[in-house]
From Swiss-Prot:
InterPro entries: Glyco_trans_28_C. Its EC number is 2.4.-.-. This is Uncharacterized glycosyltransferase MK0977. The lineage of its organism: Archaea, Methanobacteriati, Methanobacteriota, Methanomada group, Methanopyri. The keyword Glycosyltransferase applies. Belongs to the glycosyltransferase 28 family. One of its GO terms (molecular function) is hexosyltransferase activity. It comes from Methanopyrus kandleri (strain AV19 / DSM 6324 / JCM 9639 / NBRC 100938). Keywords: Glycosyltransferase, Transferase.
Length: 344
């Protein structure tokens, strides 16, 4: 969505295709833009693992769904005369671009799955093939030695995190606190872990940890969850349009290991407590980066408990997040310039 906003800012009119919650978010953010639906393909289970047998049971018509996705994107490209395709790892969009003969750009921070075994080799082979179908690979991060970049002929460009909005577009902290009814002098702990089964478990355990912590430290929890938890503890919201606002006014953010939220925290220099999903390779790599870059505390899933969360919050609450190169919230702007450059 941040890239879509920046493309509009420079006078381009993006056309979107997506499925599920992603499509709904795009329709809310861009009510006057074309947003097309795609066949839904769930590659990963709720705990973040990739299970080929589960995938085939869930989608016995997987080849047909993939073909339908290619055809849907091909029709959209032709209908609107799209000159470039930008995909966040949607393989069928790249195939559609190849068929029609327009440039393709992939945006991904997952370059290679760590580990051994035939399944890991299969996934890495698919990722490599996807990158080779593209003309440019944009990585929404800054380079460090936690990244294992595969040798591919495709141009790779590091652009920094792509945020929904630029940090300088956010309201002042006192205005955000007034908007949400957060006390001016409160020490804010934001809890947001997505809607998966394990994400909901993180939220519930975090709430119990906050109750333990409240016996020694005065904190104001802000909990983003569709489930009612906490028994009136702090502020609970089912959904927010602009999570960046709440990250800006928070002293600590408890979240899973998702790249987007961790990047938002890094750009706003808000310390995190990261709890990766048990079998999610990308999130475990992201948690490793949290430690290496000094962004906060990582709690391994096997250590997840109210006591461990309370300790992690106490450890992170006065954390000084360093300023990191390209972690400035302008990745969408850089990416938009590259996309526009393919049209010259």
């Amino acid at each position: 969505m941040g890239l879509g906003r920046e493309l509009r800012r420079i006078g381009l009119e993006p056309v979107f295709s997506s499925f599920g919650e992603g499509r709904e978010m795009l329709m809310r953010e861009f009510p006057d833009a074309p947003v097309y639906g795609l066949p839904k393909i769930e590659l990963f289970s709720e705990d973040g693992s990739f299970d080929l047998l589960l995938l085939l049971r869930r989608h016995p018509d997987l080849p047909l769904r993939f073909y339908a996705g290619v055809e849907a994107d091909r029709r959209v490209i032709r209908r609107h005369g799209c000159k470039v395709v930008v995909s966040d790892c949607q393989f069928h969009a790249l195939v559609a671009a190849q068929i029609i003969g327009v440039p393709a750009i992939v945006i991904s921070n997952m370059l290679r799955v760590p580990g051994e075994g035939s399944l890991v080799r299969l996934i890495n082979g698919m990722l490599r093939r996807m990158f080779e179908l593209a003309d440019i690979v944009l990585i929404p991060d800054t380079y460090d030695d936690t990244y294992d970049v595969p040798e591919i002929d495709t141009e790779v460009v590091w652009v920094g995190p792509i945020l929904k909005r630029r940090p300088d577009e956010l309201p002042p902290r006192d205005a955000v606190r007034r908007k949400y009814g957060i006390p001016d002098d409160a020490t804010v702990v934001l809890v947001t872990a997505g809607g998966s089964k394990y994400g909901r478990r993180i939220v519930r355990i975090a709430v119990e940890g906050l109750k333990l912590l409240s016996k020694s430290i005065d904190v104001f929890p802000v909990i983003i969850s569709e489930e009612r938890v906490g028994d009136g503890l702090g502020l609970q919201l089912r959904y927010v349009d602009n999570l960046l606002e709440l990250i800006k006014v928070s002293n600590v953010v408890i979240t899973h290991g998702g790249h987007t939220t961790l990047s938002e925290c890094a750009c706003l220099r808000t310390p995190v407590v990261s709890v990766p999903l048990p079998n999610h390779p990308e999130q475990h790599m992201n948690a490793e980066r949290v430690l290496q870059r000094g962004l906060g505390v990582a709690v391994p899933p096997e250590e997840l408990s109210p006591k461990r969360i309370a300790e992690a919050i106490e450890q992170a609450i006065d954390w000084k997040v360093p300023k990191i190169r390209m972690m400035d919230g302008r990745g969408a702007e850089r990416a938009a310039r590259i996309v526009a450059g393919t049209l010259d």
